[in-house]
Design a protein with these regions (language model features):
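Helix-loop junctions at membrane interfaces in 12-TM secondary transporters
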Residues: 1-7, 64, 262-276, 332-336
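Transmembrane core module of solute transporters
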Residues: 111, 136-305, 399
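Interfacial helix-cap and linker-helix signal at transmembrane-aqueous boundaries
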Residues: 3, 55-63, 127, 203-204, ...
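Structural signature of transmembrane alpha-helices in multi-pass secondary transporters
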Residues: 10-11, 41-49, 53, 112, ...
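Transmembrane-helix exit segments and adjacent C-terminal regions of multi-pass membrane proteins
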Residues: 356-414
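Helix-loop-helix hairpins in multi-pass membrane proteins, especially solute transporters
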Residues: 1-111
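Small-residue-rich alpha-helical segments with characteristic i,i+4
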Residues: 44-57, 67, 272-349, 380-384, ...
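Hydrophobic transmembrane-helix bundles of small-molecule transporters
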Residues: 63-183
Length: 414
């Protein structure tokens, strides 16, 4: 319970970190130069994605998992100091001066938040329980889906009534570039965050890698994300147009994820390194571009809201499709274990073994079949990521072709 509450509190704090950094950037750097800096921030995200699993694995293997949380304290303290002393609060339009306390609270859209959070929780529980804990036709799963649908409809109604004071203001979201960029990053975020979670599991279960080893084997994708993000940021700064990079991102990512579905236990390093580089290059090229798209079409006063919408879509896509991937993986593993290792009376028991323990905990006579079952269930999961990357092309093709050099924007010194 303490861990759950602690992670919830940490999640509340972390919710504004990425969008907050991008909002600070919007108030500090001209739009024409912003892609380069946004790419740099994206590269830091990739660097954190590299160092995080490696450090987490090292802490877990050699010290204690608690250091995965302790390490955030000094880093957070330095960040707080830097923002507090070096970034002055910029002037803002539509401030809450003169409003009563009740009116200020209403502007936070508490009703929308109260409705939306349980809607997402119901949807995630339904996706995680369906086919594993309970059959898809079980009344609990059906009820959760129904509750999620009803709550989402109520949320949409609240957003319509609140208009500019809504969590998702219709005036902003219904702009062509905003909703298409949000859909693009929703799909791509689901693919990328899901693969960051499940690719290491493939290395652990199929290639017998340790927690640290799987992080190292995942480096080709994450390093290429960093390099491509910086290159794309510089290219957009020089050329001005971001839409071609969004489209190329969808194409490369779909190809890369599609190739991972061909992996087998005997797949060589050239294949799993090369395919990860394709994925990373695609993700790095386009992952930051939706932010530039919405900042180009919106006025400076709306940029924080537009930026938050894109980051929100990315996070929501990751949360939903990690749950979907978990369902595909769990159901597939049970099915494939029954197929390849029929002598195991309870195939679902393999789920409790864990990817890092199968080599040590299972008898030698069943190990090849279990490894094949892990491989096939994980490649089925990679199909989800490939489909998401392919679906992101819909949003990519709808994003307007505009240049960051074609729109002078108000900027405040920082």
């Amino acid at each position: 319970m303490t861990l759950i509450v602690g992670r919830a509190v940490a999640g509340v704090g972390a919710a504004g970190i990425f969008s907050g950094a991008l909002t600070i950037l919007a108030y500090s750097v001209p739009l024409s130069k912003r892609p380069l800096y946004t790419g740099a921030i994206g590269s830091m995200y990739g660097l954190a994605s590299i160092s995080g699993p490696l450090m987490g694995g090292a802490f877990t293997d050699r010290v204690t998992w608690r250091w995965c949380f302790y390490i955030n304290l000094p880093i957070g303290a330095v960040t707080i100091f830097g923002i507090a002393f070096f970034f002055p609060d910029p002037p803002r339009q539509n401030t809450a001066e003169g409003l009563t306390l009740r009116e200020k609270i209403v502007r936070f859209d508490p009703v929308g938040t109260i409705v939306f959070m349980p809607a997402v929780i119901c949807l995630l529980l339904a996706l995680q329980w369906g086919g594993t804990t309970y059959p898809w036709g079980n009344w609990r799963v059906i009820l959760l889906f129904c509750m999620a649908g009803v709550l989402l409809l109520i949320f949409l109604f609240v957003q319509y009534r609140q208009q500019d004071h809504a969590t998702v203001p219709p005036r902003i979201f219904l702009k062509r570039t905003v909703w298409s960029a949000s859909f693009f990053i929703f799909a791509l975020g689901g693919a990328f965050l899901g693969s960051v979670y499940y690719l290491p599991i493939w290395f652990q279960a199929v290639k017998d890698a340790s927690a640290v080893g799987s992080g190292i084997m995942n480096l080709p994708m994450l390093v290429s994300v960093i390099v491509a993000s910086v290159i794309a940021g510089a290219a957009v700064t020089f050329w001005g147009y971001y839409t071609p990079f969004i489209i190329l991102c969808s194409v490369l990512s779909a190809i890369g994820y599609g190739l991972t579905t061909l992996w087998e236990p005997d797949t060589g390093s050239a294949a799993w390194i090369g395919y990860q580089i394709i994925i990373g290059a695609g993700i790095g090229i386009g992952f930051q571009q939706p932010l530039m798209a919405v900042q180009t079409v919106l006025e400076i006063a709306d940029v924080p809201t537009g930026t938050s919408l894109v980051v929100f879509s990315q996070t929501l896509g990751g949360a939903l499709f990690v749950a979907v991937a978990q369902t595909v993986f769990s159901n597939g593993l049970v099915s494939y274990v029954a197929k390849y290792v029929p002598q195991i009376e309870n195939p679902a028991s393999i789920l409790a073994v864990g990817a890092t323990s199968i080599q040590e905990d299972l008898p030698a006579e069943v190990l090849p079949g279990v490894i094949q079952a892990f491989n096939d269930s994980l490649t089925d999961t990679f199909v989800v990521f490939a489909a998401l990357a392919a679906a992101s092309i819909i949003g990519a093709l709808v994003v307007e072709w505009k240049s960051v050099k074609g729109k002078p924007m108000e900027m405040h010194a920082a």
